[in-house]
Amino acid sequence: MSVAFASARPRGKGEVTQQTIQKMLDENHHLIQCILDYQSKGKTAECTQYQQILHRNLVYLATIADSNQNMQSLLPAPPTQSMTLGPGGLSQSGSAQGLHSQGSLSDAIGAGLPPSSLMQAQIGNGPNHVSLQQTAQSTLPTTSMSMSGSGHGSGPGYSHSGPASQSVPLQSQGAISNYVSRANINMQSNPVSMMHQQAASSHYSAAQGGSQHYQGQSMAMMGQSGQGGGVMGQRPMAPYRPSQQGSSQQYLGQEEYYGGEQYGHGQAASEPMSQQYYPDGHGDYAYQPASYTDQSYDRSFEDSTQHYYEGGNSQYSQQQTGYQQGTAQQQTYSQQQYPNQQSYPGQQQGYGPAQGAPSQYSSYQQGQGQQYGSYRASQTGPSTQQQRPYGYEQGQYGNYQQ
């Protein structure tokens, strides 16, 4: 019998079916009965032999469970009598008479392992669900994502970065603080590309998508945006954002990320990043909420940003430049795009104060940072947006927020 069982086990390896598993369970059940009989008769040698066979069978089932997550469906299926009991009940029902040890083993092995696999799959799915849930959690961010999707649709540059950021916004927007912290970490890990795209686009999506929700989402998103995009800079930017975090961060954070995100993403990110990279320049910038008035902010930001773009991250500045150029176009386009979105223009109109400020600021920036201003000039909409953030910072943000 033991030989037959032992031989049955290897035969089952090639074909893992419910019949094979059921046969294995029946075999184990019979083995346990034999073991119990021999134990009652005091025949320890036979008990040991059957226990070894049982152990091999259980290990085999465990191996199958590990190798095939579908086994989880297979295991419950064979014991229709114990379907309600599940794999554990299955094993125990299969080996019910004192096979509980086996049942437990089988459960642990058969049921437990597939659940582990499931859990892993669920864990794998979990994050997806998480991001979805996060997305679901923040319907506005979700909407903003949709907005960002459309916005990205409007802004081709953001179309691709938008989708990526949409993924990010899903998460970052969904679990804005948490994920954004993660995203920020990630973004910080990839401050340039990731943040540039994700943060930018997430902020952009936040900005666009959120632009309608703009304050509500931009608050959340700007927490993101500020965090996501600014995260890199947000640490240093935190001072800046905190000043603006109350409101202007939300608006400004996004604004920066919205305009700055696109542009300011280079900027805003650069601003934060520049703050990080240019804590000195952005120390001012960080503290420039006060000195943040257009000139100080613009200077430090431009300087830092210029440094950051040009000097600080030549690659980022180049990337940003390329991105900004693309973005500038996109941002310019986005400016158009935002106007196209009207939500943002409304937002911009909402920003209007900020936008007026941006005009000031952009005039200032353009005047101030010809380089950056010029760049902003192309991205004046975004930079204006950033300028708007600055604007708000100047109280035009208050207007925006109002």
From Swiss-Prot:
Motif, SH3-binding: chain positions: 377-385
Region annotation Disordered: where it falls in the sequence: 72-129, 141-170, 195-250, 262-290, 305-402
One BP term from GO: positive regulation of transcription by RNA polymerase II
Motif (SH2-binding): 50-53, 359-362, 397-400
Region (Necessary for interaction with CREBBP and for the recruitment of CREBBP to the nuclear bodies): 393-402
Keyword Calcium: yes
GO molecular function, one term: transcription coactivator activity
Highest taxon of the lineage: Eukaryota
Compartment(s): Nucleus; Chromosome, Centromere, Kinetochore
Pfam families: SSXT
Region of interest called MFD domain, as start-end residue ranges on this chain: 251-323
Regions of compositional bias (Low complexity) in chain numbering: 92-106, 196-224, 311-379, 390-402
Polar residues composition-biased segments: 117-129
Gene Ontology, cellular component aspect: cytosol; kinetochore; nBAF complex; nucleoplasm; nucleus
InterPro entries xref list: SS18_N
Residue span of region Methionine-rich intra-molecular domain: 149-237
Subunit: Homodimer. Dimerization may be necessary for its function in neuronal dendritic development. Interacts (via C-terminus) with CREBBP (via N-terminus), EP300 and SMARCA4/BRG1. Interacts with the nBAF complex. Association with CREBBP facilitates transcription while the association with SMARCA4/BRG1 suppresses CREST-mediated transcription in resting neurons.
Family label: Belongs to the SS18 family.
Summary of the function given for this chain in its UniProt record: Transcriptional activator which is required for calcium-dependent dendritic growth and branching in cortical neurons. Recruits CREB-binding protein (CREBBP) to nuclear bodies. Component of the CREST-BRG1 complex, a multiprotein complex that regulates promoter activation by orchestrating a calcium-dependent release of a repressor complex and a recruitment of an activator complex. In resting neurons, transcription of the c-FOS promoter is inhibited by BRG1-dependent recruitment of a phospho-RB1-HDAC1 repressor complex.
Note on domains (UniProt): The MFD (multi-functional domain) domain is involved in transcription transactivation, nuclear body targeting and dimerization.
Entry protein name: Calcium-responsive transactivator
Gene: SS18L1
